[in-house]
Each structure stands twice: as structure tokens, then as C-alpha cells.
């Protein structure tokens, strides 16, 4: 049994073991990678998922790790033109030297409401030696998780690097293009002078809509959010989608259970103003419990799963 969940800081050492060697990390690079990845998770600037086992002798083992980040225009421009292979390694080294690589949360909100975002897969790895059927299931589940991670953001460039033949056929089959290629014997890194052929894959918003296809079009052209939620209300819904209870939220956020309940009441009030039909079929019980309260929440979360733009960071533009 396998499941996909949000990556936790405590997962990162195991995640590094999975990708070790793919990016020619030195010992110093490894320490910097752990620090950088932890910073991205703690600051909510990174999007990350792990696929783990749910049962059996390896219960809890991480089989797949993915970490994505919204990078600056300058870093994306270099990634597509002049940076050497191993973009995840180059990002770690840039960050370690004090240079800007990624956008902070407030900048993500600004660009998500404006010109759009540059999404780069910073690290991706699969545990070696997986049986063929497990490997295929894991890849399918992570692809679905990726759609959930990216949906609702206004993306202008989407880029992922692949080494050798790993994921090559999968990516091309979805319509992703090869943007750069490095030959087999390119001097990829001082730590490892020769390596497998490397490709940089991606899509950008400037192409023709028909070139994107239905699989990708919504990532570049998300609907406008309608509910007008505050950042605190968005966080409440996001955590609920991750199956956190109200008590879980109160503990993890360091707020009272009353504050959590108040957030839900504010959300319902906004929904009733904008889309009253969404909740009218399940009554008006308050959120303190009961069948109607449970059904109202279930209906609301079902809507949000289909409209993740409602909970993405987004600056309110002044007109």
C-alpha cells in the first residue's frame, strides 16, 4: 500500500539519500541542500511531496521524493541558457553563496496575481530497485500529486531536468518539450567529470494553446478565485485538504479551537455571498457538529479540490 503526502522536515535526510549521486553532491553540498530544502519547507516557499509505504516490513519508507520551487526570472533565464547540468545542485550552491534563487511567499502571491510564476523541479528521485509494478504505480501517483500541487497557480514557465532516460518517455508523452540537452560526456561538475546525457524539459505560456493540450493548459490559465478568502482562511482549507482536524490545526498553528471555528464561519459566510447554491442543499447547521455541519464541510472541500486557485497565495491588486 502506497500513499502520497506533504514532505516534512524530518523526511529530508531520507530524501537526500534517494537523490544522492544524481546531482554530484559533495559533503558540503549535502549539508547545504538539507538546509536549503528545510528553509523552503519551513517558509512555505517550496512545494514538496513524498510517496511512502503504508504497510508491511518497510512501513513508512519513502520511495519517491519531489521538491519544486518558484524561482526568480533571472535564475529561470540562466537555467534555460547558460547554467550547467544539475540545476538542483546549481540552485543549492547559489543559495549557499547568498544569491537569490527562489521567490518568498509574498513574492509568489504578487506574481501569481500578476505576470505569472517560474516553476522549477529542484529535486526528484525514486528509491532504487523497485519492482516494475510498484515503480509504475509510484510514478502514476506522483504525477497525480503533481497536478494537485501545481493547480491554481498562474504559471508562465514549467521546467524539470532529467538525467539519462529517467522519466524521458513519461515527460514527452504528456507533451512536455526538450528545451536543452547536454551530451553524454559533458563536464557536468568538477566532482564528476562525465555523466549521463541530461535534458531540460519544459513548457511555457507563450506557446499556442493547442500546443499545451488539456493536460497542461489549466496550469498556465487558471480561473480567477471567486471567494475572496484571507490568507488565514486559505491555510485552514489547505490543512483540511491534508486531513487535519480542527484540533490538529489549533495545535500546529498555536491558536485556540475557537479561532479555528471562527475561520470556518468566515469561510462559509463568504461562500454564501458568492455561491449560495454550493451549501444550500445541506442546510445551515453551524460548524460545531452534526450531520449538516459535516456535509457542509464535505461539499466545500470537494469544490476547493476542483478549484485550488481559491487557496493559492495571491496578492489583491489595487485598481
Language-model regions: role of each:
Residues 1-17, 28:
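A short beta-loop-alpha structural element at the N-terminal edge
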Residues 69-120:
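Conserved acyl-donor/pantetheine-binding loop and adjacent beta-alpha core of acyl/acetyltransferases
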Residues 237-244, 304:
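Short helix-to-turn junction characteristic of helix-turn-helix DNA-binding domains
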Residues 233-240, 249:
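Short alpha-helical "packing" element that flanks the helix-turn-helix/winged-helix DNA-binding module
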Residues 27-59, 67:
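Active-site rim helix/loop that mediates acceptor-substrate recognition in acyltransferases
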Residues 245-295:
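Recognition helix of helix-turn-helix DNA-binding domains
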Residues 33, 95-102, 109-115, 123-231, ...:
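Linker/hinge segments immediately adjacent to helix-turn-helix/homeobox DNA-binding domains
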Residues 64-68, 124:
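Conserved GNAT-family N-acetyltransferase fold
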